[in-house]
Regions:
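N-terminal secretory signal peptides that target proteins for export/translocation
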Residues: 1-33
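The N-terminal extracellular segments of secreted preproproteins, especially immediately downstream
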Residues: 4, 25-29, 51, 181, ...
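Bacterial N-terminal signal peptides
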Residues: 39-49
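Bacterial Sec-dependent signal peptides at the C-terminal "C-region" and cleavage site
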Residues: 48-59
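Calycin-type beta-barrel ligand-binding domains and close structural analogs
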Residues: 60-88, 116-363
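Short secondary-structure subsegments characteristic of cysteine-rich extracellular domains
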Residues: 93-105
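A short helix-loop-beta-strand connector motif used in the catalytic cores of GNAT acetyltransferases and
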Residues: 110-114
Length: 363
């Protein structure tokens, strides 16, 4: 397989959301390596698909338990942004690269079904652009699942609730803001949930524009992905932000494992250059996460691993790619690939090795 068609290029950072949108979001929803290694990977990927049970169909268009079973999880649009770069889409026209965390957390004072939301950009966990708290209920009159979107009065207090859910369990309604008219209504149709706001109901006054700004969200949820189309318009119907195509976010799978790097790959001057140094405790998701390889003793090797589900450009076949990158440049040194649903994947280059197993897979 030619690396011309699969090797992940260095990404140009997607255009940031403008300041007007940011204000809206805040107010509304809220030579050491040996030649024998070469550039070829010895693939040790075991294409063992996870035998996941199928969830039964919903009992109604507003089956909340079924909906939440699909909704909860983490999502990322890495392949969408990667493909746009491959296709030569101008950086300003590419979708923003966004990672979404939708974590159910019990908060009885707010509602019976509540979800902590964190969305960050460019694979940088600290680059948070939106943080919300969702509450779901069944609206019998509409025959829909109703999503109320709450902003935090103090976002910093709950910034890491996804890592420490206990901090949010006692949150009170007074610590949140909800914008009337901006609720989303979900209904199950044709094997998917479609979410939308009431037309013209969600708006705010922009002091900069000296007029109202109207928001519309259109969403599609399946068991494997969520598509999000956010748009804003002025009073004359001119679009202020948003794209024709939605952000296509796929649900991630996490993998754990290890790597080992021979010392002379990054420090050839040492007395024992043949020593293999272990990098334990790796954890990364399969939608483009990059993790630097740091040894048990804290030594930076100068290499990283990237795990990503991508599409082979010649045949349009989906693959799970495990790439070895130079940390400083993002250049791909070598990669292996497996079936996109594989439970295990690995690589052996002689001077470095790595093995990853999907969380929850049989050992």
């Amino acid at each position: 397989m030619s690396t011309e068609y699969l090797t992940l290029p260095r990404m140009v950072a997607p255009t940031r959301i403008g300041m007007e949108q940011h204000r809206l979001l805040s107010r509304r929803h809220g030579g050491g390596a040996r030649k024998t290694a070469g550039a070829l990977a010895v693939v040790i990927a075991l294409t063992i698909g996870a035998a996941c049970g199928q969830q039964p169909p919903p009992r109604s268009a507003a089956d909340l338990d079924h909906f939440l079973g699909w909704f909860a999880g983490e999502y990322d649009n890495n392949e969408q942004v990667w493909q746009q770069a491959i296709d030569g889409v101008a950086p300003a026209e590419r979708h923003e690269h966004i990672h979404h965390i939708f974590l159910p957390i019990a908060a009885p004072a707010v509602g019976e079904h509540t979800v902590f939301v964190k969305q960050y950009m460019d694979g940088d966990y600290e680059n948070v652009y939106r943080q919300r708290f969702y509450s779901f209920s069944v609206n019998d009159e509409r025959g829909a699942i109703e999503l109320a979107i709450h902003s935090f009065n103090d976002e910093g207090k709950y910034r890491y609730a996804d890592r420490d859910p206990a901090v949010i369990e006692r949150i009170e309604p007074g610590e949140l803001r909800n914008m009337p008219g901006c609720n989303v209504y979900w209904r199950f149709e044709d094997g998917r949930y479609l979410g939308e706001m009431d037309d013209g109901a969600c708006f705010y006054y922009s002091a900069n524009l000296e007029q109202n700004v109207y928001i519309t969200d259109t969403l599609t949820l399946t068991a494997e992905e969520i598509r999000i189309g956010d748009k804003a318009f002025d009073e004359d119907g001119n679009r202020l932000f948003g794209r024709d195509e939605p952000h296509i976010n796929r649900k991630v799978r996490y993998f754990g494992g290890w790597a080992a790097v021979r010392r002379d790959a990054f420090d050839p001057s040492v007395a024992d250059p043949e020593e293999m140094l272990l990098v334990p405790g790796l954890r990364l998701h399969n939608e483009g996460q990059v993790v630097p390889l740091v040894t048990e003793s804290g030594e930076e090797t100068g290499f990283s691993l990237e795990l990503s589900r991508l599409t082979y450009q010649n045949t349009r076949v989906a693959v799970l790619k495990l790439g070895v990158l130079k940390t400083a440049t993002g250049e791909t040194v070598a990669y292996s690939w497996a079936d996109p649903d594989a439970a295990r994947i690995g690589i052996n280059l002689g001077w470095m090795q790595a093995g990853l197993t999907a969380e929850g897979a049989a050992q």
